[in-house]
Amino acid sequence: MAIRTQYENSNEVGVFATLTNSYALVSLGSSCNFASVFEAELMPQIPVVQTTIGGTRVVGSVTVGNRKGLLVSSICTDTELRHLRNSLPDSVEIRRIDDRLSALGNVITCNDYVGLIHVDIDRETEEIVEDVLGIEVFRASIAGNVLIGSYCRFQNKGGLVHVKTTTDEMEELSQLLQIPLTSGTVNRGSDVIGGGLIANDWVAFCGMSTTATEIATIERIFQLSRPKEFDPSVSNSHTLRNALIDTLI
């Protein structure tokens, strides 16, 4: 299930939230509806933590994580770090990263097993990513774009990459990640996939402008299927909501 939402008037949901198989972070702000969309779909199985990072709302841009760990930018305050540690599962290791490329969500992207990082990221940061998240990492770019986290999104079963990614490049990345990939867009033609889309292994959240065709591509490549222990009535309500939105955009 891929669910449309927005943060206040922005369709860049990946800028304001981070989603993994064990937790979700959403920006603390005036948009109560944004957090409630995540809570309705994920809780109580997955905690949804409302927070800021360094006093900013761009939580998705300055954090990156998976089910095993969470990396936050050096701008994260001690109070925010303590809040995260008190709110996330004990099994999730949290580390603050001091790197000149501080927008971690734009320069690192990963699933539970492997990650792609900006070609110029510090070697020390690379080692921390591998250690805290428990993954193997590769330096890469997407369709000539070094902001790897902005132009692709993947989880454990598949991934979406920049629409101008070549076939050869996509095949190489697919072999590195060991998952199928396809090129596409979100938010009615936007190629900033990481900004407009977040996903774990059973649900994705995308901007309100995302078309039905884009939704279909997302659901197919990510092989989204709801775990049996989740209440199917919630999924049915979102199906009806998406159908209504399709008639309006």
From Swiss-Prot:
Keyword Ubl conjugation included in the entry's annotation: no
A Pfam family reported for this protein in Swiss-Prot or TrEMBL: eIF-6
Main subcellular localisation: cytoplasm
Residues forming coiled coils: none
Gene Ontology MF terms in the entry: ribosomal large subunit binding; translation initiation factor activity
GO CC aspect terms: cytoplasm; nucleolus
The organism's place on the tree of life at top rank: Eukaryota
Keywords on record: Cytoplasm, Initiation factor, Nucleus, Protein biosynthesis, Ribosome biogenesis
Intracellular or extracellular location(s): Cytoplasm; Nucleus, Nucleolus
SUPFAM superfamilies: Pentein (SSF55909)
An individual GO BP term: ribosomal large subunit biogenesis
Subunit structure comment from the entry: Monomer. Associates with the 60S ribosomal subunit.
Sequence similarity: Belongs to the eIF-6 family.
Known function: Binds to the 60S ribosomal subunit and prevents its association with the 40S ribosomal subunit to form the 80S initiation complex in the cytoplasm. May also be involved in ribosome biogenesis.
HAMAP family: eIF_6
Protein name as annotated: Eukaryotic translation initiation factor 6
